[in-house]
A protein has these predicted regions:
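Short, basic, glycine/proline-bearing loop/turn elements
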Residues: 140-145, 208-213, 243-245, 310-311, ...
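Positions that flank functional sites
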Residues: 177-178, 245, 394-395
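Switch/communication elements of ASCE P-loop NTPase nucleotide-binding domains
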Residues: 1-52, 193-328, 345, 515, ...
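Short amphipathic alpha-helical segments and helix-helix/interface helices
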Residues: 159, 256-260, 279, 283, ...
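Conserved P-loop NTP-binding catalytic core
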Residues: 42-137
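Acidic, Mg2+-coordinating catalytic modules of nucleic-acid enzymes
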Residues: 1-19, 24, 49-51, 67-73, ...
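Extended helical coiled-coil dimerization/tether regions that scaffold
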Residues: 120-223, 228-237
Length: 564
């Protein structure tokens, strides 16, 4: 039995509001020590009107009637008269006076809150695997292991999910005497011909040889501890602090998928995490339920960026975004968007050398100029400080940068005239051969070949005819030095406007022009450069170091980008 007691809305310290559905999964993310766990504690404390920090300052929630609450209490607890009348249940003790106070105000008495809402800290889930006192099978369970003994469907869910992660089933040893330890292994199968005493001895003999859950490592105990509480039916909502703790990435991803599975439908979950694997797992199984809150801190001030359901669905359903590493940006203070993996490798190495005293940003390849805006939109909504690093020929197609300007607080109109100036200059000298003239030129080269064999020189001549270089190609190959006079001044003004929006065009044109001594191009270029010039302080990298130093050059520029 579970009461319908949803949290309807959260109000954060900065006044932002997040409305919730009855089965929402709210995931708090952000850098270390930003306030993720504090947000969980604030929500949990407000439910019972207890002191709280105030990162979440208001919680609007629906409180079930007294009769509904009392029906649940009678079903899942044991009433005891001594020393005073009270109810004992799974993780709670409720006294008569707390029942009397239930209807006197909008908040929950603390003990009743603990019955209906579970706050699963690291210590709580590690200790959940400890042996429990054996109880009467006819009474309610007062702990998760006792519940495993009483509820076969609950045991099946816990055991199957644990087996998916660790290839071992879970079995409570209720033949051990005064305590019920949790064993790792399959439930013994007995013969119909055995007597009751033989069955007891047989099962005890097998279970006593199994590994004990409470003696395992923290990863096993943490994973199992979460499962033990997650599948308890009566909780209206759960709060789980960093469920990925002690888990390897594949297990963290599986835990995320379990958290978002259909077994948790109809219940709200509030999670704090710094694991992209766990978040990806939740998104893969329950994207429609997820709300993301990115918490950051500067000094004593916290900031909150809210990602609503539509944004989350775009993040999880758009193939480009889903299979990128964009989710990882949630856990970094800054992100650098590059065109390719090779760009990311090169710029990260230069950053780590030139700006070693600063936290390294996430370097994220987007797969081409036209895709920068897709990533920038999400990063902006999440309040993530970012830099876009395109080749200079991003100017060729305004559609590739118009939205970047808009997100950054500027506009196409602010650069339109200068762009036309640059465009006209670059395209003024383009002369292309007609098809007839091109065929004539190639025929002449082929006719001159001796012995019917085409030499490398002749191939080069043909390629030269076909590969007519435009002014845009020259801009990409030489950067701003391809321009002179007023077009160069216009380019400089565009460059300044772009930088104010967090867009830093490669000053030498494209990545490969930073080290002209290496003629490779494409994915292998960066690896070849590092092999030829392993000392990143070498003068050959001076232009690249200067360029990387220009990103976020001051607090003013950083503030501009952070407001995108």
């Amino acid at each position: 039995m579970r009461l319908d007691a949803p949290i309807k809305e959260l109000v954060f310290a900065d006044g932002q509001r997040m409305p919730l559905e009855h089965d929402s999964i709210v995931v708090f993310v952000g850098p270390n020590n930003a306030g993720k766990t504090t947000c969980l504690r604030d929500i949990y404390s407000i439910l019972s009107n207890e002191p709280h920090v105030g990162l979440v300052k208001e919680v609007d929630f629906f409180k079930p009637s007294y009769d509904e609450m009392k029906t649940l209490l009678d079903k899942i607890s044991v009433k005891t008269q001594k020393p005073t009348p009270h109810y004992d249940g799974l993780g709670f003790t409720i006294h008569e006076f707390e029942l009397e106070n239930y209807s006197k105000g909008p908040y929950y008495p603390k003990a009743i809150k603990e019955m209906m809402f579970s706050f699963l800290s690291t210590d709580a889930r590690l200790s959940a695997c400890n042996p429990e006192k054996n109880i009467s099978r006819s009474g309610p369970a007062t702990g998760p292991i006792a519940l495993l003994v009483k509820d076969s469907s609950y045991l099946e869910k816990v055991s199957e999910s644990f087996s998916d992660a660790f290839s071992q089933e879970v079995t409570p040893n209720y033949f051990a005497g005064g305590e019920i330890p949790l064993c790792l292994g399959p439930t013994p199968v007995v013969s119909d011909e055995m007597s009751a005493s033989e069955v007891s001895d047989y099962i005890y003999g097998i279970l006593s040889k199994y590994p004990l859950a409470h003696l395992q490592g923290d990863g096993v105990r943490s994973f199992l501890g979460i499962l033990l509480y997650l599948y308890i039916e009566h909780y209206s909502a759960m709060f789980i602090d960093e469920p990925e703790s002690f888990l390897h990435p594949p297990q963290a991803n599986l835990m995320g998928r379990i958290i978002g599975s259909s077994d948790t439908s109809g219940r709200q979950l509030f999670i704090s995490t710094h694991s992209k694997e766990l978040l990806n797992g939740v998104l893969s199984s329950a994207a429609g339920r997820v709300r993301v809150v990115r918490v950051t801190r500067q000094g004593d001030d916290n900031a909150f960026a809210l990602l609503d359901g539509d944004d989350v669905r775009e993040l999880s359903s758009t193939t480009l975004l889903k299979y990128s590493d964009l989710v990882n940006a949630l856990f970094h203070e800054r992100t650098v968007l590059c065109e390719s993996d090779s760009d990311c490798m090169f710029y990260q190495a230069i950053w780590d050398t030139e700006r070693s005293g600063e936290a390294s940003p996430l370097f994220l390849p987007v797969g081409g100029k036209s895709r920068f805006k897709n990533f920038a939109i999400i990063l902006s909504k999440l309040g993530i400080d970012y830099a876009v690093v395109p080749d200079a020929d991003i100017l060729r197609n305004p559609g590739d940068f118009k939205e970047l300007l808009s997100i950054g607080g500027s506009s196409w109109e602010s650069v339109k005239d200068d762009w036309k100036n640059v465009k006209n200059d670059l395209e003024r000298g383009e002369n292309r051969l007609s098809a007839v003239a091109l065929k004539t030129e190639i025929d002449e080269i082929l006719d001159s070949c001796k012995g019917g064999q085409i030499s490398e020189k002749d191939c080069g001549r043909i390629r030269g005819l076909i590969d007519v270089k435009s002014g845009w190609d020259e801009l990409k190959r030489h950067g701003k030095t391809a321009l002179k006079g007023e077009p160069l001044s216009a380019y400089g003004r565009i460059e300044k406007t772009f930088a104010g929006c967090g867009v830093y065009m490669v000053p030498v044109g494209e990545l490969e022009c930073f080290v002209l001594e290496v003629t490779h191009h494409g994915p292998s270029w960066a690896a070849e450069v590092f092999q030829c010039y392993p000392d990143l302080n070498d003068d050959v990298y001076s232009k690249a170091r200067k360029f990387v130093s220009s990103w976020w050059p001051s607090d003013e520029a950083s503030d501009c980008c952070s407001q995108k």
